[in-house]
């Protein structure tokens, strides 16, 4: 039997979810977390037991919640995200209470009949990269000559 034949397709999606280093989160149409893989635990610090059944507010900073839910609800009504708005770097919350930056990709999930089921997100911790880019921008600003101010 070949290796390909020995892979049980029905278990493959579970193996992929468990093995991927990125966070994979699925929330239903009410914004309740229904799937939280081990990568999500690594990125956000919450276990699946702490997350499943909770609102996405668990990982959304309070000041960003209105914008998040406005976008979430519009995507449900529209039947998907707008082109070009499927990926972004945004702030999120870690279990420690510390803000983190995540590089997040979104998709609305539909069943084969086209019925909207909820949304999924794949996220990577981008905090170190964001801080490094911020430091590089600051250094560049310090090295860039400023226009001379006219004497008064």
Region roles according to the model:
Residues 6-35, 39-41, 84, 145:
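Sensory modules in modular signal-transduction proteins
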Residues 7, 11, 130-148:
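Sensory-domain boundary/capping and coupling elements
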Residues 39, 48, 60-102, 110-112, ...:
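PAS/LOV-family and closely related PAS-like sensory domains
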Residues 43, 50-52, 59:
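Alpha-helical sensory/transduction surfaces in regulatory modules that relay environmental signals to outputs
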Residues 57, 110, 127:
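Adenine-nucleotide cofactor-binding loop residues
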Residues 104-106, 123:
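Sensory-domain boundary capping and coupling elements
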Residues 115-125:
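PAS-family sensory domains
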């Amino acid at each position: 039997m070949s290796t390909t034949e020995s892979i049980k397709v029905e278990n493959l999606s579970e193996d992929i979810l468990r093995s991927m280093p990125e966070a994979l989160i699925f929330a239903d149409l009410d914004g309740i977390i229904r799937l939280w893989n081990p990568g999500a635990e690594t990125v956000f610090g919450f276990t699946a037991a702490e997350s499943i059944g909770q609102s996405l507010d668990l990982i959304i900073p309070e000041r960003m919640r209105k914008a998040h839910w406005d976008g979430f609800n519009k995507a449900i009504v529209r039947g998907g995200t707008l082109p070009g708005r499927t990926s972004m770097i945004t702030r999120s919350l870690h279990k420690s209470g510390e803000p983190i930056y995540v590089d997040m990709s979104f998709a609305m999930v539909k069943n084969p009949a086209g019925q909207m089921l909820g949304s999924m997100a794949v996220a990577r911790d981008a905090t170190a990269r964001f801080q490094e880019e911020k430091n590089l921008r600051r250094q560049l600003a310090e090295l860039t000559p400023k226009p001379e101010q006219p004497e008064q």
